[in-house]
């Protein structure tokens, strides 16, 4: 399995519904095993082995204490494990399929966290895949479940369905028109959470936001996904209206901004992660507005992923100081955009 190589996961390659705005959808199910305290370090490795036995050769097991710090960071940048697992889960592990659209974290905050990712706004497809895996596990192992409270989890906010549905969106139109603050306030008033690209603990940046449900108790899985889908449909509509307004009323200023960012990335020799991310966001907007017919959405995803620190260290084959990282980032970006 080439998970540590510079390639996109399937959910970043394939197209999906509303993928001019929605980058990806994710469903995560948190589960714990009955009669096992969660989590207890002395028991953790045995739990990993017990759960791993449930899965066939379509999944590959990676134990956190058997892979390098760089490899862990690569998995985080590909959204296949959480930053928490990389930093704190000494006895954790992850099961991955070849397409990298299913990630099953073992001994993170819970014994088992099933993640399924899809391109675009396809939450129901991700839910179906996650529930299928969940059912397969439950045929072999017994979950910690309470008739009143539902699935029992290490964090009380996950009790009930144990489901976290999230959607990653690119909202440069709402950011530029300064409507993003009111939109986020409206989202939060409906009981949803807005975070950055790496979820809990990360802040939104470069017009990329992650929207997820907060309530897991008192609603069914289908109701949670339906509610989030309806909210996302409203956000998508507002973002498209904002983009149209920008193109119609501020066309030359918008075009200048987008092409300046393109010129920067095509010609820079030193660039920071934040400066690159902002320019990539501008170019992605330009792609969606038809300014760059030769640049695909897949290429935009390559720019985002392969300009991250761990992938740059992988490219260089060594650790780097801050300046070296900026130089390698500029080189990688130029190569992706075609300036070889």
Curated annotation (Swiss-Prot):
**GO MF terms on file?**
ATP binding; creatine kinase activity; protein kinase activity
Listed under catalytic activity are:
L-arginyl-[protein] + ATP = N(omega)-phospho-L-arginyl-[protein] + ADP + H(+)
Listed Pfam families: ATP-gua_Ptrans
Give the matching SUPFAM superfamilies. Answer: Glutamine synthetase/guanido kinase
Matching entries from InterPro entries are given as:
Arg_Kinase, ATP-guanido_PTrfase, ATP-guanido_PTrfase_cat, Gln_synth/guanido_kin_cat_dom
The UniProt record lists the keyword Ribonucleoprotein: no
Q: Which UniProt keywords apply?
A: ATP-binding, Kinase, Nucleotide-binding, Transferase
| Any GO BP annotation | phosphocreatine biosynthetic process
Q: Which residues bind ATP?
A: 24-28, 79, 113, 164-168, 195-200
**Lineage: superkingdom:** Bacteria
- Annotated PROSITE patterns: PHOSPHAGEN_KINASE_C
Phosphagen kinase C-terminal domain ranges (all copies): 21-242
Q: Which GO terms describe its cellular component?
A: extracellular space
EC number(s) in its UniProt entry? 2.7.14.1
Presence of the UniProt keyword tRNA-binding in the record: no
The similarity annotation says: Belongs to the ATP:guanido phosphotransferase family.
Q: What does this protein do?
A: Catalyzes the specific phosphorylation of arginine residues in proteins.
Q: What is this protein called?
A: Protein-arginine kinase
| Lineage, top ranks | Bacteria, Bacillati, Bacillota, Bacilli, Bacillales
């Amino acid at each position: 399995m080439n998970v540590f190589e510079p390639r996109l996961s399937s959910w970043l390659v394939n197209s999906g519904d509303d993928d001019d705005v929605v980058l990806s959808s994710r469903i995560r199910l948190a589960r714990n095993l009955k009669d096992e305290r969660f989590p207890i370090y002395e028991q953790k490795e045995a739990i990993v082995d017990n759960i791993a036995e449930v899965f066939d050769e379509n999944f590959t097991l990676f134990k956190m204490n058997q892979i390098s710090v760089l490899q862990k960071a690569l998995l985080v940048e590909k959204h296949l494990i959480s930053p928490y697992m990389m930093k704190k889960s000494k006895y954790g592990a992850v099961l991955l399929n070849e397409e990298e659209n299913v990630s099953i974290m073992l001994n993170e905050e819970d014994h088992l966290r099933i993640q399924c990712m899809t391109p675009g706004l396809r939450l129901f497809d991700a839910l179906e895949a996650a529930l299928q895996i969940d059912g397969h596990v439950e045929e072999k192992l017994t979950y910690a479940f309470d008739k009143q409270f539902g699935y029992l989890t290490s964090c009380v906010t996950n009790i009930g369905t144990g489901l976290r549905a999230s959607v990653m969106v690119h909202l440069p139109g709402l950011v530029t028109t300064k409507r993003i603050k009111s939109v986020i306030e409206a989202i939060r008033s409906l009981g949803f959470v807005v975070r950055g690209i790496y979820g809990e603990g990360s802040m939104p940046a470069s017009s990329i936001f992650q929207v997820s449900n907060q309530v897991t108790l008192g609603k069914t899985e289908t109701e949670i996904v339906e509610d989030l889908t309806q909210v996302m449909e409203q956000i998508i509509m507002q973002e498209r209206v904002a983009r149209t307004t920008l193109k119609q009323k501020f066309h030359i200023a918008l075009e200048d901004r987008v092409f300046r960012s393109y010129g920067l990335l095509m010609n820079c020799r030193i660039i920071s992660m934040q400066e690159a991310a902002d320019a990539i966001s501008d170019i992605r907007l330009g792609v969606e507005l038809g300014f760059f017919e030769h640049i695909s959405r897949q290429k935009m995803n390559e720019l985002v992923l392969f300009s991250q620190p761990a992938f740059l260290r992988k490219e260089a084959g060594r650790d780097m100081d801050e300046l070296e990282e900026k130089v390698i980032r500029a080189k990688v970006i130029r190569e992706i955009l075609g300036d070889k």
